[in-house]
């Protein structure tokens, strides 16, 4: 092992820097496998017998059979060839230099011939010819294939022959599931301007990809009905009717049945019986839909127009009444928009026959109707913003346009499904079949809109498994999984769920394990095949886009400046705009390829674990874990995760030393993958092989540090090894390691390495503070945030001189004068000398309201909202206000301490007169004060002044004398009499700035 680690520096350079074993790693596979019998075997002397019969180094990886070898004639490029990018034609170039450029790019990519054919024929796969494409490669009606089939390289489109329809054909072939707009335009064009056979072919291709698109089925059926093609119409109904629970489609079916069965010329009654059976068939399948109200009403009207009288006594009449009663009783139990009208009709129907029995029937069905009515209101609220479309679209990628709107629609569908599962109509216990029908129906409605959302397929299948839902003796859950996989061939979730269901419920597991393993493996193989096709498609798109960009750059060259720029300190060569765009394209496709490779790798890991459970370790030929690992290496496009998972399975489950060889193999394939190296180090440490672990660490670190591009990857390796040395190593080794880390990563805090010695994922004894004094260290934070600018501004306002108080205007002062005869309090009277409260009667809040208020006072005050605290903080100090301030506490005290007698006492005292009486003043006030109440200080007699006799002063009763002085505000003039001495007769000054309360 130690010597093996030292040999990594001499390994192939092509393997370095690659962390994905796809087409590039296949070159390494061939190189390393060719060395397996030479250098690798020589390095493994003494350990060859440990592997037993299985040696991963001896696996022969042949050329994948799925990719054909390119024909020699296909390597010759055409001098003028149109290019396609995103469904649009890019003008071809006659320059021959692009051939050499693309050949150089292909050599740089190091693509083996077995993985990607070194020919430009792949670039024509995205842009097939108009009609010269052979049926062998491009089928006329692809079945739910997300990736268009390959096009022969000898097919060269001719530019003059292209039209709008041809461009639409290219768009739908390039993106069959995503370009819904192109599909609709293409269908409309063929329907309106092409022969019927062409329109049929287009419709057929569309419904194979979107089999639940009810609107397109209706268009196709109406097109056939336009030409009276009844045989084709019935065939279409047989294909779509049971698969598409759409009200519009089933309504078209009813119209067709009524059209084909003439009720006016029906002496035998066979036509009416056929229509009746059709209505029952439709009601049984689509009658639970909340939009099926019109079908119910049409059925009722159809029965009413039939033979017989509703109030008759003949057997036919009674049969008609029983039929109508049955329809009504079923219809009023369905939550739909017409349930209220149907209930009114049912009420009139029953009461018109017999009021006694009618009331009985109405009372029996009334609870069901009320439940349906309330459920309809609830459904209106749930589905108010729901888009019940049957033309599904691919879900937008997270963070892109339409992502949030699509997820909102998904949540609405989930809310509707959850509402149906809660059983608001109370059907689960009494009518379980009706309950299952309703839930399954809403699942089917959701699948019509969310066809490309795998989660909804799995959710529906899981519910069917739990409730044992079957249709036509078929397990509905399995059918949903199969249909979901057809709609989403690349979905790993659906493939894993289907394989898991097969593994759990396979009938004869012990009889034939090979057949059992093949049944479980089929979903894995299908999704892997789709993912590999998508990976090839990504590579082809990348080459096509780069070649198109080079053609455009060659046709429009940009002259670069040759002047020296003094601002450029370094002498690094500048890239042209074309090179920058090519680099950006390569980075984008590299990220997409990496994502596909990781997905493929984890599917292989899941398959390896499943086969190990079924067939055990197995062998390279018979099956099991090792067979899966061999197949995965042959297919390629693997990440290091596959090697880690298989090596750990061999080591942990079977205690086989082959796991170490797999790790060694992965270390040569992924020398710059820091995560793989960490797993390798963990494995060696688990085996107490510290010597080889240190060799592996040093070898990988030296390789990563030598390249500035991979220097950042070394930090994770250093962190892991430093943690291991901190726990089990010597202090000298720890110090040396920390010095090396500080030298390589000077931007990291030096204290961090020291702290990492003693911390774990659960606890950090150094960073966690120790509380010494709760008083000093655990003070609660202030609720009101301090804003520095406003705080300084308020301080400056408080320190600045206050403005001079202005004199009060006499007229507003009179308006603000209080009508209370009680003496106003001074400014600080309440604060210094609180008023004595007189004993009062029982408070009206002694009951529950009082207890609630008392509880609120006892509870701790809640923190104010952030915006409120900010507003309170920026308000100026109260000292900056110049206007008179309102003392709310004094007003509340007056209202609280004032005792108001009852009306009898008030009337006996002479009060109760209206306040708006004729004044006794000799002159009328100005027009502004004509309709205001009289001033309590005006000249009026004791008998005429109701307010003067008010018992607000019970100590004197009605013995008050009139005020001998009119207020100066009443006359609008300055007083001519001398000011009365201070005392009871003089009016008191305003409580706050002259205001009276």
From Swiss-Prot:
Main function: Component of the cleavage factor IA (CFIA) complex, which is involved in the endonucleolytic cleavage during polyadenylation-dependent pre-mRNA 3'-end formation.
Biased composition (Acidic residues): 46-56, 92-111
First and last residues of every HAT repeat: 194-226, 228-259, 270-305, 319-352, 389-422, 434-466, 654-686
Protein's cellular compartments: Nucleus; Cytoplasm
Biased composition regions of type Low complexity, renumbered to the chain: 32-44
UniProt xrefs under PANTHER family: CLEAVAGE STIMULATION FACTOR SUBUNIT 3, RNA CLEAVAGE STIMULATION FACTOR
Protein's recorded name: mRNA 3'-end-processing protein RNA14
Classification lineage: Eukaryota, Fungi, Dikarya, Ascomycota, Pezizomycotina
GO molecular function, one term: mRNA binding
Lineage top rank: taxon: Eukaryota
Keywords: Cytoplasm, mRNA processing, Nucleus, Repeat
Name of a matching Pfam family: Suf
Region (Disordered): 1-152, 549-579, 792-854, 907-997
Keyword Repeat annotated: yes
């Amino acid at each position: 092992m130690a010597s093996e680690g030292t040999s990594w520096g001499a390994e192939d350079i092509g393997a370095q820097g690659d962390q994905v074993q796809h087409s590039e790693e296949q070159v390494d596979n061939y190189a390393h496998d060719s060395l397996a019998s030479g250098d690798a075997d020589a390095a493994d002397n003494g350990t060859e017998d440990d592997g037993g019969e299985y040696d991963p180094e001896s696996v022969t990886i042949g050329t994948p059979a799925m990719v054909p070898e390119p024909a020699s004639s296909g390597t010759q490029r055409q001098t003028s060839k149109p290019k396609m990018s995103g469904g649009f034609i890019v003008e071809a170039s006659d320059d021959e230099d692009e051939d050499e450029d693309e050949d150089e790019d292909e050599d740089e990519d190091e693509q083996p011939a077995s993985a990607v054919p070194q020919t430009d024929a792949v670039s024509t796969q995205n842009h097939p010819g108009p009609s010269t494409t052979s049926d062998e490669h491009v089928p006329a009606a692809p079945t739910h294939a997300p990736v268009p089939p390959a096009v022969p390289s000898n097919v060269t489109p001719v530019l003059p022959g292209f039209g709008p329809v041809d461009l639409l054909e290219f768009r739908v072939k390039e993106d069959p599931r995503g370009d819904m707009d192109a599909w609709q335009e293409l269908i409309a064009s063929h329907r309106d301007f092409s022969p019927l056979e062409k329109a049929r072919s287009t419709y057929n291709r569309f419904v194979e990809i979107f089999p639940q698109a009810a609107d397109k089925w209706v268009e196709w059926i109406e097109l056939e009905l336009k030409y009276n093609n009844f045989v084709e119409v019935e065939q279409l109904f047989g294909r779509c009717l049971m698969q598409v629970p759409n009200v519009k489609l089933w309504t078209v079916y009813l119209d067709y049945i009524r059209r084909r069965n003439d009720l006016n010329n029906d002496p035998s009654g066979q036509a009416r019986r056929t229509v009746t059976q059709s209505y029952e068939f439709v009601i049984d399948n689509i009658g639970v839909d909340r939009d099926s109200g019109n079908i119910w009403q049409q059925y009722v009207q159809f029965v009413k127009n039939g033979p017989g009288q509703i109030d008759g006594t003949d057997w036919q009449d009674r049969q008609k009444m029983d039929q109508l009663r049955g329809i009504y009783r079923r219809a009023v139990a369905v939550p739909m928009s017409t349930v209220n009208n149907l209930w009114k009709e049912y009420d009139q129907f029953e009461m018109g026959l017999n009021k006694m029995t009618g009331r009985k029937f109405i009372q029996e069905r009334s609870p069901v109707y009320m439940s349906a009515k309330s459920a309809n209101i609830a459904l209106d609220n749930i589905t108010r913003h729901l888009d019940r479309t049957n033309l599904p679209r691919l879900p937008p990628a997270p963070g892109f346009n339409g992502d949030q709107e699509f997820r909102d629609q998904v949540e609405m569908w989930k809310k509707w499904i959850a509402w149906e599962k809660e059983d608001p109509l109370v059907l689960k216990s009494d009518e379980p079949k009706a309950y299952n029908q309703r839930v399954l129906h809403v699942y089917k409605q959701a699948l019509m809109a969310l066809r490309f959302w795998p989660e909804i397929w799995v959710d529906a299948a899981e519910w069917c498994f739990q409730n044992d839902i079957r249709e036509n003796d078929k397990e509905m859950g399995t059918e949903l999984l199969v249909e979901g996989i057809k709609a989403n061939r690349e979905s790993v979730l659906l493939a894993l769920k289907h394989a898991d269901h097969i593994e759990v419920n396979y009938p004869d597991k012990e009889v034939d394990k090979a057949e059992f393993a093949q049944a479980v493996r089929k979903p894995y193989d299908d999704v892997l095949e789709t993912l590999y096709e998508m990976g090839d498609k990504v590579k082809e798109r990348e080459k096509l886009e780069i070649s198109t960009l080079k053609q455009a750059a060659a046709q429009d060259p940009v002259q670069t400046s040759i002047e020296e720029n003094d601002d450029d300190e370094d002498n690094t060569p500048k890239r042209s705009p074309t090179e920058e765009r090519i680099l950006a394209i390569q980075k984008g496709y590299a990220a997409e390829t990496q994502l596909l490779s990781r997905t493929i790798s984890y599917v292989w890991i899941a398959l390896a674990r499943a086969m190990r459970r079924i067939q055990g370790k197995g062998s390279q030929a018979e099956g099991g874990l090792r067979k899966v690992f061999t197949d995965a290496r042959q297919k390629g496009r693997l990440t290091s995760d596959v090697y880690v998972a298989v090596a750990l399975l061999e080591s942990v489950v079977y205690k086989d030393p082959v796991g170490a060889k797999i790790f060694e193999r992965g270390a040569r394939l992924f020398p710059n993958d820091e995560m793989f190296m960490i797993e390798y180090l963990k494995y060696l440490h688990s085996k107490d092989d510290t010597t080889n672990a240190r060799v592996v660490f040093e070898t990988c670190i030296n390789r990563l540090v030598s390249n500035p591009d991979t220097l950042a990857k070394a930090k994770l390796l250093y962190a892991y090894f430093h943690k291991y040395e901190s726990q089990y190593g010597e202090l000298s080794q720890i110090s040396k390691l920390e010095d090396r880390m500080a030298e390589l990563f000077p931007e990291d805090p030096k204290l961090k390495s020291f702290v990492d010695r003693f911390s774990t994922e659960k606890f950090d004894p150094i960073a966690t503070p120790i509380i010494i004094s709760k008083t000093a260290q655990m003070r609660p934070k202030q609720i009101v945030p301090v804003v520095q600018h406003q705080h300084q501004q308020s301080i400056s306002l408080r320190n600045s001189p206050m403005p001079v108080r202005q004199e009060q205007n006499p007229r507003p002062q009179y308006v603000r004068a209080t009508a209370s005869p009680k003496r106003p309090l001074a400014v600080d009277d309440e604060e210094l000398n609180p008023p004595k409260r007189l004993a009062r009667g029982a408070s009206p809040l002694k009951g529950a309201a009082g207890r609630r208020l008392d509880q609120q006072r006892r509870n701790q005050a809640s923190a104010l909202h952030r915006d409120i605290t900010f507003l309170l903080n920026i308000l100026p100090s109260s000292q900056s206000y110049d206007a008179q301030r309102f003392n709310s506490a004094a007003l509340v005290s007056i209202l609280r301490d004032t005792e108001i007698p009852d009306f009898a006492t008030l009337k006996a005292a002479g009060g109760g007169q209206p306040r708006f009486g004729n004044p006794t003043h000799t002159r009328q006030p100005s027009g502004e004060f004509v309709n205001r109440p009289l001033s309590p200080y005006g000249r009026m007699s004791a008998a005429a002044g109701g307010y003067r006799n008010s018992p607000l002063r019970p100590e004197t009763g009605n013995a008050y004398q009139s005020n001998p002085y009119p207020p100066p505000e009443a006359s609008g003039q300055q007083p001519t009499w001398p000011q009365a001495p201070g005392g009871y007769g003089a009016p008191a000054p305003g409580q706050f700035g002259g205001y009276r309360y």
